Amino acid sequence: MMNKKIKILIGVLVSILIISIIVVSYYFTNLNNNVTKAKIDDWKYSNKESNKEYVTSKSSSGVFSVPQGSSSSLTSDSAMSFSSKSESTVGLSVGGSKNVDNFRENIKNGYFPISTDITYNGLFYDYYFETGKQEESEDLFSPSYSMAISKDPISSKNEYYMTVGLNSNIKQSDFKRKKQNIVVVLDISGSMDSSLQSYYYDGNNNNIFSKLEKNKSKMELANEAVNLMIDELNNDDRFGMVLFDDGAYLGKPVSLIGDTDIKAIKEHILDIEARGGTNFEAGYKKGTDLFDDELLNDKEYDNRIIVITDAMPNMGTTNKSDLLKYIEANSNKGIYTSFIGVGVDFNTEVIENISNVRGANYYSISSKEQFKKILSEDFEYMVTPLVFDLNLNFESAGYEIEKVYGTDSADKSSGNIMKVNTLFPASTNENSESKGGIILLKLKKKDNQTDNKINLSVSYTDRDGNKHSNSQDIEFNKDEEFYENTGIRKGIVLTRYVNTLKSWILYERSNRDERFYIDENIGVIDCDYAEDDVQRILGENERISVKLTVSEEYKENFRKIKSYLENEKNELKDDDLNQEIDLLEKLINC
């Protein structure tokens, strides 16, 4: 009997002990979880900030340190693998300009654009292209080539074209971006306080969108854009932030998203106000300084600075060639740069000049909804350069390259060479067409030559730093109008459209009359002001608005190109071309 009672007692004690262990374990587990879940609000900036960091330039090269002979160290993405022909693949597109929103917004609001507002590669990225039949390959990049003879709609002369189809062999299901070290460099200068639809340097008298109309400012959209970008980051991504006006400020040190009180950080960002001058050099340098050796040596991460600005630097280094050196220096260290341009007065000329660098790209935005769409479709692609330093060597007795359209390095492409700084991944649609997936070459047929053979040799560097090359032979033996596929036809249509618009801008710029003259950097200037006076008032990168102007001669040209686009829209069955037709209609009725 005693033994039975002892056994029961022991059983009760054991049960109590087990329950106690469970309770204690549960307590400590929850305690640890609570500690783990504690988030850090590491925001450093205040709108009353006084500890500015200035960067002054005592020479044309500035004080920014440009490393010599450095190279980026790229690591491979083990998640990426090559596809079989039966599975859809990721497309490829050129870096640099990724849309033409600034051009469209200027026309929409009745302003005269500058030529860099519309780019070939930016417009191509608004459309999907059939890239042509590609050869069997397991290489990361697999080019395809398509040919066409097309009659010019204005001159009626036959023109010869070839597209380079930008194909990858990465499966859509296997594509995954690397973890990111992202530093946002935010422009908080006074010009960011103006309305999205107005030009800051017009002044109050010319500003057609007054504060009383309560239009959203560039600063408000920029703040919202940062928060939208944060939403795209994962817990194992890192994020930091710098702000600049006439000086530079630390907004937030680089830290893991998972350790950060994101709600608090977002609230701080929405409180940011615009003020002061625009010292891009100071902001970019301070943003670069956040990438210490520990970050740069962590090969699980890619590194990127994202600059959000209206691109009108007027303090520190303002020369575009010198600013370009800073972007190139970072690229050589494996720190790549993206630009997000805000406002109708976003200076595309500045960004177009400094973004044609390995790993760089830029977008212009005009609304929160538009940027949200860009991020949802493109964020993983915009931070993942795949192909660098692409060279195409074109050898033919019968043809030579006359012009290259749609690269981020057009100034280095001519004769027998086509160059591209960077290819980024791009989406494909249900028809296996690739977004922005071509480069168009206009060819010149040599006189008295009957040899139609063309040898095309491609070389490039992948993100691991490995060099690749391949070669193909093709024949161009057609004499009458034809298009090998819809991709090359669409590329020709869009190129002729851009050519007409750029020609119009240059024509109006050179057409000085009694009413106005047009300056290359400033735009249309009323003749009440002398050119030297305007240059003294405005900095080299500051834009004033210009009323939309179309001469009768170009209205007739626009009618012809509009009719051409309407016909090609039907042939291509692409209703997206309606946006270009509508824009031409506005210009015709201007």
Locations of the language-model features?
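Polar, glycine-rich mid-to-C-terminal structural blocks
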Residues: 336, 358-366, 372-377, 383-430, ...
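Von Willebrand factor
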Residues: 6-216, 220, 228, 232-233, ...
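Low-complexity, intrinsically disordered segments enriched in Ser/Thr together with acidic residues
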Residues: 432-449
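Short, aromatic- and glycine-rich surface loops/edge beta-strands on solvent-exposed regions
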Residues: 441, 453-460
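N-terminal Lys/Arg-rich, disordered targeting/topogenic segments
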Residues: 1-5
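Exposed acidic/Ser/Thr-rich ligand/metal-binding surfaces
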Residues: 21, 152-388, 446-449, 580-590
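Solvent-exposed residues in well-ordered beta-strands and their adjoining turns
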Residues: 167-169, 395-397, 444-446, 461
